[in-house]
C-alpha cells in the first residue's frame, strides 16, 4: 500500500468490518484453542448496534477493500479503544499503529483504556510500547487471561 489514508467508516461498511473481524481474529483464536471467543460469534445486528455508539476508522487498499480498522468511544472522559484489527496479509506495515494513534488523537479524552488477551503477545507488547499499563486482569478460560490496560496523559510541572 503506497499511501495509507485513514477515513471514518460508514454504516455501509459494517458487513465488511464483520468480515475483517473474522479474518483478523479468527486465526489468533484458533491458535489459542479459543474457538468460542465472543468476538467470533458476534452478529451483524450486534455490530450495527455497536457501530452506532462508536467512532470507527478504516483503511482501505487500492481496490476499496477494508484492510484495517479500529473503533473508540469516549464516556465520562475515558476513551475505550476496541477492535484494532488488520488483515493478516497486511500486518507489519504500520497500519495498526497508525489507526491506534489516530483514534486517540481524534477523540479527546483524559484516559484511554482497552482490553486484550495477554497470551497474544504481539498486540499486548505493542500496547505496552505505546505507553499503556496493565491495571486489571481476568481469567477467561484455560490458559487465557484478559488484560485491561490504560494510559493517562503525561502531566507537566
Tell where the protein language model's regions lie, with residue ranges.
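Conserved acetyl-CoA-binding loop-helix of GNAT-fold acetyltransferases
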Residues: 86, 92-105, 129
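Conserved beta-strand in the GNAT
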Residues: 58, 65-73, 80-85
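Conserved GNAT-fold acetyl-CoA-binding loop/helix
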Residues: 19-47
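A short, internal acetyl-CoA/4′-phosphopantetheine-binding micro-motif in the GNAT/acyltransferase core
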Residues: 84-91, 116-118
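A short helix-loop-beta-strand connector motif used in the catalytic cores of GNAT acetyltransferases and
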Residues: 46-58, 80
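Conserved GNAT acetyl-CoA-binding A-motif
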Residues: 106-118
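Conserved active-site alpha-helix within GNAT-family acetyltransferase domains
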Residues: 97-98, 119-136
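A short beta-loop-alpha structural element at the N-terminal edge
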Residues: 4-19
